[in-house]
Structures are given as structure tokens and as C-alpha cells.
Amino acid sequence: MIGYLEGRVVARRDRFAIVLTPGGVGYELELPTPVAAALPAPGGQVSLFVHTVVREDALELFGFASLDDRETFRTLIGISKLGPRTALAILSHFTADDLLRVVASGDAEALVRVPGIGKKSAQRIFIELSYKLEGRAPAAGLAPSVPIPGGVAGDVVAGLTNLGYPEPEARQVAAEVLEAEPDLDVAAALRQALKRLASAKK
């Protein structure tokens, strides 16, 4: 598995580059837009952290300027129904620290700025991301604990935990309910969540 590359930029475009290593092998990498924009002109030297995706018919490489951004990419692709292209699109709009601040502030709506992510998907991604990033804090030093998501999702999670449900289970069912019906108010969403939890125990 390729985890790091150093070499000379041969070509670059909006979200990809070809890097020629000293061994004479040229690697094509997909990149977050800001990383691609910051690359030197062809002929310049670059070093990138790499995530490798092995498929039956292809070997895909995703490049990042920092180890934190690569680890955040790996966290994102661990979210259900979120593939590497969507993760790359998110990291084209937010750095690793930006995402930690989004989670810490409870601002799920911020994710809607990413092309291809609607309100329903943003709520689901936000809740799963909050759980996965628990205990991490941005470099600026926001509190390391991840709060319960804001808005309707946060109220549903709070209501379920007050009823004795474990927080991870509450976050998961809240995400499922609001993904299915993103316009529910708190009371209706809580009722749906309780129905799902009751059905799961049968």
C-alpha cells in the first residue's frame, strides 16, 4: 500500500496530478481542490500523504498535504454511504480542523455547501462524523469533547438519552429517522425514533 510520495510534478489539473518519483514511476493522484491549487508548476517538487484504494480493475490514489487530512479522509469514507469522491469533495471545502469546528459548533447545515450533499445527507453525515471524531479537537483548542448535534437531531438524541438509551444508539437512530424524513419536528422525530427502537427489540 502506498502511503507517501515524493517526486516531481508532471501535470496537474483541478483535482488531480501526476507525480514522477525518483525511481521513474509516474503516479496519478486525486486531490482536494486546495491541495491541487497549491501544487508547484510542472517540474516542481512535491510530497504528499497518500490513501490507496485497491479495486478489481484499478488502483486509485488520493493525495493530501497533511497526515491529519488523510486521516480525516479515512474517517469520512468510514461513514455509511459515503464514498471516496464525496469525501474528497468535503475536503475540498473543509480542512480537518474545519470539520472539527463544524462538529464542535453543531453546524450540520455547513455540510450542505458541498456539492452533492443535501440536507438529509448532511444530517446523517454530521451525526456519524460527530461520533467518529469524539475526543479530537482542532488545533485552535476547542474543547475536545464532541457535543450532541444541534437542532432537531440534537433534541432527539438528548430526549433518547434522557430516557435511558445509550448515546451511540441514540445518535444512530436519530440519523436514520432524519435521513428518511428530514422535515420532521422534534416531537415527531422522537416518536419515530422510539418506534424504530421498539421494533429493533422485537
From Swiss-Prot:
Gene3D superfamilies to which the protein is assigned, alphabetical: 5' to 3' exonuclease, C-terminal subdomain, DNA helicase RuvA subunit, C-terminal domain, Nucleic acid-binding proteins
Q: Locate the region Flexible linker.
A: 145-155
Instruction: Give the start-end ranges of region Domain III.
Output: 155-202
* Chief location bin: cytoplasm
Q: Which Pfam families match?
A: HHH_5, RuvA_C, RuvA_N
Cellular localisation: Cytoplasm
GO MF terms here are: ATP binding; four-way junction DNA binding; four-way junction helicase activity
Q: Which UniProt keywords apply?
A: Cytoplasm, DNA damage, DNA recombination, DNA repair, DNA-binding
The protein's superkingdom reads: Bacteria
Per the record, the GO terms for biological process are: DNA recombination; DNA repair
Region feature Domain II, mapped onto this chain: 66-144
Q: Name one GO cellular component term.
A: Holliday junction helicase complex
State the residue spans of region: Domain I: 1-65
Which Cys residues form disulphide pairs? none
Task: Please report which protein family the annotation says this sequence is part of.
Answer: Belongs to the RuvA family.
| NCBIfam families recorded | ruvA (TIGR00084)
Task: Summarize the subunit comment.
Answer: Homotetramer. Forms an RuvA(8)-RuvB(12)-Holliday junction (HJ) complex. HJ DNA is sandwiched between 2 RuvA tetramers; dsDNA enters through RuvA and exits via RuvB. An RuvB hexamer assembles on each DNA strand where it exits the tetramer. Each RuvB hexamer is contacted by two RuvA subunits (via domain III) on 2 adjacent RuvB subunits; this complex drives branch migration. In the full resolvosome a probable DNA-RuvA(4)-RuvB(12)-RuvC(2) complex forms which resolves the HJ.
This molecule's function is given as: The RuvA-RuvB-RuvC complex processes Holliday junction (HJ) DNA during genetic recombination and DNA repair, while the RuvA-RuvB complex plays an important role in the rescue of blocked DNA replication forks via replication fork reversal (RFR). RuvA specifically binds to HJ cruciform DNA, conferring on it an open structure. The RuvB hexamer acts as an ATP-dependent pump, pulling dsDNA into and through the RuvAB complex. HJ branch migration allows RuvC to scan DNA until it finds its consensus sequence, where it cleaves and resolves the cruciform DNA.
Cite the HAMAP family for this sequence.
DNA_HJ_migration_RuvA
Description of its domains: Has three domains with a flexible linker between the domains II and III and assumes an 'L' shape. Domain III is highly mobile and contacts RuvB.
Q: What is the protein's given name?
A: Holliday junction branch migration complex subunit RuvA
User: From what organism does this protein derive?
Assistant: Solidesulfovibrio magneticus (strain ATCC 700980 / DSM 13731 / RS-1) (Desulfovibrio magneticus)
Its taxonomic placement starts with: Bacteria, Pseudomonadati, Thermodesulfobacteriota, Desulfovibrionia, Desulfovibrionales
Q: Which gene encodes it?
A: ruvA
